[in-house]
Amino acid sequence: MIHDANIEKLGDHFIVCGYGHMGRAVVDQLNRAEVPFVVLETSEELYRELLEAGVPAIHGDAKSREILLSAGIERARGTCIVIDDDLENLSITITARSLNAKLKIITRAGQRCYADSLRTSGADEVVIPEYLGGLTVGRMIRSSYPTQAILV
């Protein structure tokens, strides 16, 4: 485990688990909103990229209690679990909830069938990117038709 000593000073922050496509978008939004956060990432290459960009990060597996504790989960406001693996997200959700009962847990589900399991395991919010993308495309299509045509 490698991390920045300043992470130990964080409180009321968010822990972002995963720095893939979705994790990058989350980090961008947190930076814009000036929300304190730390990223947990298993990839050495992505971890180094985070450090070079000055992003607080820990190189390690978010399924590990020790890694979550080193990220300050007991002092955190919430966690955003956006790894592209439903079973890993489920495992992290269970561990995170066991370490902080008040933690806001937002997690990703690649498949709708995992959403209920994630909620039952402690997730407060479950995001299904492909489903949300479908809703957005559907709205775009509907907006190209007159309102009365939709109200059939």
What is each model feature region?
Residues 1-152:
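Cytosolic regulatory regions of ion transport systems
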